[in-house]
Amino acid sequence: MAERNLLKLAEVQKRTALSRSSIYAKVAAGTFPRPVKQGASSVWVDTEVQGWIDALIAVRDQQHAA
């Protein structure tokens, strides 16, 4: 199994260039990976966040190629 790391909200914001409210709105809409509860905090699985980013890039590349 691939190694997975957990990301705090600040790191997710940095990697995605999204605001806190945008991240949670996308989670609520089902278009962004759901966080994992770690005590009172929420964290995200790094491979899931990277997969979301990769999917955006793939859509862009498909549109550009068409």
Could you say what each language-model-derived stretch is?
Residues 41-45:
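Minor-groove-contacting beta-hairpin "wing" of winged helix-turn-helix DNA-binding domains
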Residues 35-37:
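Beta-hairpin "wing" of winged helix-turn-helix
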Residues 58-66:
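C-terminal secondary-structure termini that scaffold catalytic or DNA-interacting sites
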Residues 1-28, 48-59:
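Polyanion-binding surface elements
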